[in-house]
Amino acid sequence: MKRFLSGSLCALLAAWFCCQVRVTASEGEATLTSWPMFRGGPSLQGVSPGALPDKPVLKWSFKVGDPIKSSAAIEGGLVFIGADNGILYAIDLLTGKEKWQQTTDGMIESSPLVLGDRVFVGSSDGYLYAFEKATGKPLWKYETDDQILGAPNWVKSPDGKSFWIVTGSYDYFLHCVDAATGKGVWKYETGNYINGAPAISDGKTVFGGCDALLHVISLADGTKVNEIEAGAYIPGSAAMDGDRVYVGHYESEFLCFDLKEAALKWTYRDRNFPYYSSPAITDKWVIVGGRDKRLHCLDRETGKDRWKFSTRGKVDSSPVVSRDKIVVGSSDGRLYIVSLSEGKELWSYEIGESIIASPAVIDQWIVVGAEDGFVYAFGK
């Protein structure tokens, strides 16, 4: 009897342990060797601590065969990326060889999130999926009532005992899901589609959508903290830094809001072209792409423009700042590196097809997918 109880207890403990999401202190945030999610970390600031090569060279390209709008995640020497064929790929960073793939029933425009030993991604089939990072083994899927196009984000539960995944859907809801079990924790209803990823900081999540509102939600219970009129629908994702939120919208304006004051701090307007790109923010600057074919660098305190960099196509790709450089794609088919201080071109690579996806950046590496159906990796 004692032996039976001991064995049963071991089995129960093993089952419990396997259901946990194990996360170290450095995981879930961008590091020199990791870009685990869209924009690098929960506040969606789009900044990598790594350095870019002065003259990157193409190390490998991986053929998917269908257009890629999903932005890559890099973790543990693997690249994770989705494609319009509905497949999530895991690719060896050093060799460009496929490690595993898993298929969903819809296009994957959402960018993967790597947290602990799991990979999470949304699909246009309306499900949020969880897979084992090392093998691709399906763990669970959570159903929403419409397509998921934006990337998931993550937060610790208020008691610190579990992790939650937060994602928007075209069913008008923001969903909070337990990362270990796939069970819903709460959901928050908006007035229209949710396009982008929710930004997370200081116990709050901020996001916009087609209802032209910037929603501020308590992560503890999914209740409304505030909602702010943006003036037009928001195609992309906001970036947060403390109480400041930076976001562009469809009616050609880029905005800075103060959450504590629930007030608009400044508005930047140049040409009559919308902003689909999500911004990168540093301690001094905000950098965002526009459909006016330009990359804009703004003073984050005043909204005054510092410089503009022109490409030959719409810039829906979201820029990433890597120390004194910026990397961004354009629908002109080129990947660019631009100096942060002056906005001058330092390097470019012609892929030949539109780049809508945003680059993933770690030390000495850039990974990006393109509309030609290839994933490209650049290094020194």
Language-model regions, residue ranges each:
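Bacterial N-terminal signal peptides that target proteins for export
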Residues: M1-C10
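C-terminal segment of classical bacterial N-terminal signal peptides
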Residues: A15-R22
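Mature soluble domains of exported/periplasmic/lumenal proteins and thiol-rich metal-chelating peptides
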Residues: E27-G28, F38, K344, K380
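Short cationic/low-complexity microdomains
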Residues: V338-A360
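Repeat-blade elements of multi-bladed beta-propeller folds
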Residues: A30-G40, G65-Y89, Q102-Y129, Y142, ...
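A short beta-strand motif characteristic of beta-propeller blades
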Residues: L58-F62, K97-Q102, K137-Y142, K183-Y188, ...
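Short loop/turn segments that connect beta-strands within beta-propeller blades
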Residues: D92-T95, E132-T135, D178-T181, S218-G222, ...
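Blade/loop signatures of beta-propeller domains
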Residues: G28-K59
